[in-house]
């Protein structure tokens, strides 16, 4: 029977960075309306969503589950089980988000998708605020919960009206979603920066 040594190198920073890149691509476009959405922009954003936000998180989620089960090198931190669930689920759902954006598909089903992801986000913030030193990741999950609340409003275009000239009023939910994407994306960049410095250079910054 082989014994695997515990590892302090859980690869969460790759997931933080990948999702942060996705948010900082999607967020400004949603908030500012630039570049204006068309087929080319949607295909470009779709590719980034699939590979950066999707694949990076999915890879980390699978890696964590393997490191918690088959090769138990991360079992000293039980909160990583929640991280594995979140990275796997968020990664897979970004495959769908990115592909739908690439294809120009209807975004309304995203509104229903947001409901279970609010649940996962609340689960994450509950676990990490309780975990020792886990509040920075708790803040992240709080931001993610807000993202999915605004995703619901944006996807169903709540409050959008058709004006007398045929134009539509501003989708406030989309603007709020974009602003939240930017803020959470910046927090993800901070978590990437702080956690990498803590592990690689012995810093003691608040991080994962």
Where are these regions (language model features)?
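Transmembrane alpha-helical segments of multi-pass membrane proteins
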Residues: 48-55, 87-88, 113-120, 180-184
């Amino acid at each position: 029977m082989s014994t695997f040594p515990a590892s302090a190198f859980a690869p969460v920073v790759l997931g933080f960075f990948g999702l942060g890149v996705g948010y900082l691509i999607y967020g400004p476009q949603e908030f500012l309306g630039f570049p204006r959405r068309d087929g080319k922009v949607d295909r470009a954003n779709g590719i980034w969503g699939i590979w950066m936000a999707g694949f990076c998180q999915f890879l980390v989620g699978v890696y964590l589950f393997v490191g918690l089960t088959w090769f138990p090198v991360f079992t000293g931190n039980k909160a990583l089980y929640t991280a594995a669930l979140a990275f796997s689920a968020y990664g897979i759902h970004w495959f769908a988000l990115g592909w739908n954006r690439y294809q120009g598909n209807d975004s309304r089903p995203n509104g229903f998708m947001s409901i279970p992801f609010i649940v996962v986000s609340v689960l994450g913030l509950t676990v990490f605020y309780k975990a020792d030193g886990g509040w920075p990741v708790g803040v992240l999950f709080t931001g993610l919960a807000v993202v999915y609340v605004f995703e619901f409003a944006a996807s169903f275009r709540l409050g959008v009206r058709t004006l007398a000239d045929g134009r539509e009023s501003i989708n406030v939910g989309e603007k709020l979603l974009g602003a939240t994407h930017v803020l959470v994306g910046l927090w993800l960049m901070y978590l990437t920066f702080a956690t990498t410095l803590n592990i690689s250079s012995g810093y003691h910054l608040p991080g994962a």
